[in-house]
Amino acid sequence: MEKSGYGRDGVFRSLRPPLVLPKDHNLSMVSFVFRNSSSYPQKPALIDSDTNETLSFSQFKSMVIKVSHGFLNLGVQKNDVVLIFAPNSIHVPVCFLGIVASGAIATTSNPLYTVSELSKQVKDSNPKLIVTVPELFEKVKGFNLPTILIGPNSEDSSPLKSRAKVLTFHDLVTLSGPVSDFPMVDFKQSDTAALLYSSGTTGMSKGVVLSHKNFIASSLMVTMEQDQAGEMHNVFLCFLPMFHVFGLAIITYAQLQRGNTVISMARFDLEKILKDVEKYKVTHLWVVPPVILALTKNSIVKKYDLSSLKHIGSGAAPLGKDLMEECAKIVPHGIVAQGYGMTETCGIVSVEDTRGGKRHTGSAGMLSSGVEAQIVSVDTLKPLPPNQLGEIWVRGPNMMQGYFNNPRATKLTIDKKGWVHTGDLGYFDEDGHLYVVDRIKELIKYKGFQVAPAELEGLLVSHPEILDAVVIPFPDADAGEVPVAYVVRSPNSSLTEDDVKKFIAGQVASFKRLRKVTFINSVPKSASGKILRRELIQKVRSNI
C-alpha cells in the first residue's frame, strides 16, 4: 500500500488506527450513548442557549427513559415512524433518543418547510405521531395525527392542549410513571434507527435509512482524534439544524456519546454564536462555509473573546484554502479544519488530522477510520490512482442501508460490492488527503472542458469586497454552457462586473473565465449551508 493508502486493487484505505466497533450485536445506539455516563452523572450534557436550561447526564438519561416509556404508552410500536418537526432545543435529542429507545424509527424535518413540502415527507414516511413546537402546530394540524408539543412555550399552549390528540412534553414524561430503566425492547445493531431525508439539492429529497450501527460507527470515527489526544472535556455549540445529519449525528449524538457538552441553539445568529462561545467557553465550533464566510467578513467578531476555541470544523460543502486561512486568523490558538460526509454516510467520510504535521489546507482530510474509497473514472468506471480526478465511491460501517421505499434509487447509489456512489468529484493526493471538487451533476460543460463552480466560487469570495457568490451554467450556442456568476458585494463596494471578471481571469485558464457577472442581495442556500444552485438555474432559464 502506498503512503496515500492506495492499494493494487484500486482501493484507498484509511491511514488512521483501526476502528474498534462494539461486539454486542444487540446493542442499541441509545445504550451506547449512555454506556459511560455513570462516570460523570453531574456533568452538563445539554444546555439550551436560549433559555439556559441545563440537563446533566444523569437528568438526560432519566428524561430519555421517561420519554421512551411515554411513547410506548401512546401506542407507538417497534418500527413505527415518529416525526420530529421542530427547531433545535434540548428536547429534540431527548425525543429523538426516546423514540429510538422505544423501538420506533425517528424521522426529522426542516421546520421551515411549508405544509406542501412537509406533506411529501409525511406521505413517504407514514408517521404515527408528530413532535413539534406550538409555533408550528398550524402546519401539522391538517395531518390529524397525535401530536406532542415541545420547547420552552409548550406548557403555555393551553388552547392547543384542549384539542384531541395534542399533548405537551410534560404530559409525555408524566405518562411514563415512576420508571428508572429503559423499556424491554429487542434490538439489533442492524435495525433502522432513523430516517433522515437528504437535502434534495439535485432533485426530490429521499429518505435515507440509517441503522444503530451507522450512528455508533460514525460517532466513533468523529471523536477518534479527541480520544487519541486524551481530551477530557469539550464543549460544542450546535446551531446547525438537528434535523440534518451534521447537527444530529456529527455534533449532537457523537459528542454526547463521548461525554462532551452540547449547547443547543435554535437558529443561526452570528452575534449570538459569538456571545455563546465567550459565555460557555465553547471549545469546538462546527459550521458550514457560509458561516466561515461571515466570521471572516464581519468586524463584530473582534468584540468577543474567542480564546476558548480549539477547533473550527467545516463541512456540508467544499471550503477553499484562502477562506480557511482567513478564518484561522480569528482563532490563533485553534485550528480550522474541513471534513466531508453526506446523509448517506451518516455524516462522515473524511476529516483533517489536526494533531500536527504537514497541513493540507483546502483538503477534506484523510479517510476516517474504517472507511474505504475509490476514485472512479466517470468515462471508463475504472479505479484511478492518486492525483487523478473522478467520482468518489465509499464504503464502511457508517454507510446507509438504502433509500426508504425506493429500491430503484438504492440500486443506482449502492452497487453489489457495497460502494456508495456519492456523485461528488474529487481526488486523493500522494499523502492520502481527499480533495472534493464539486458535484458531478453541477459541472459546467464548456466546449468539452469541465468547469467546477465551487472552484470559481472559492476564488470569488477570496476578494475582500465580495461577501458571497454562486456560479451556474448559462446556455450558449457555441460553447454549450458558459460560467456566469451571481455576486453579493460588501456594503459601500463599488465593484463592477469588469472588475470581477478581471479578478477571476488572472487566476484561471481561459475556459474557466466568467462570461457574465450579476450582483444580487443574497445567495439561495439550504438549511445545511449548501448552495441551491438548481433553484437559481431554473429561475434564470425561465427568464431566457
UniProtKB/Swiss-Prot annotation:
This protein's record includes keyword Transferase: no
Region (SBD1): 269-338
Record keywords: ATP-binding, Cytoplasm, Ligase, Nucleotide-binding
Residues that, per the record, bind ATP: 198-206, 338-343, 424, 436-439, 530
EC number of this enzyme: 6.2.1.-
Region named SBD2: 339-403
Gene3D superfamilies, per database record: 3.30.300.30, N-terminal domain of ligase-like
Tissue: Mostly expressed at low levels in glandular trichomes (lupulin glands) after flowering and in flowers, and, to a lower extent, in stems, leaves and cones.
Keyword tRNA-binding part of the UniProt annotation: no
Residue stretches in coiled coil: none
Enzyme superclass (EC): ligase
GO molecular function: ATP binding; CoA-ligase activity
Gene Ontology CC entries for this record: cytosol
Subcellular location as annotated: Cytoplasm, Cytosol
InterPro entries, A to Z: AMP-bd_C, AMP-bd_C_sf, AMP-binding_CS, AMP-dep_synth/lig_dom, ANL_N_sf
Main location: cytoplasm
Family the UniProt entry places it in: Belongs to the ATP-dependent AMP-binding enzyme family.
Domain notes: Both substrate-binding domains (SBD1 and SBD2) are involved in the substrate recognition, and are sufficient to confer the substrate specificity.
Protein known as: Probable CoA ligase CCL7
The encoding gene: CCL7
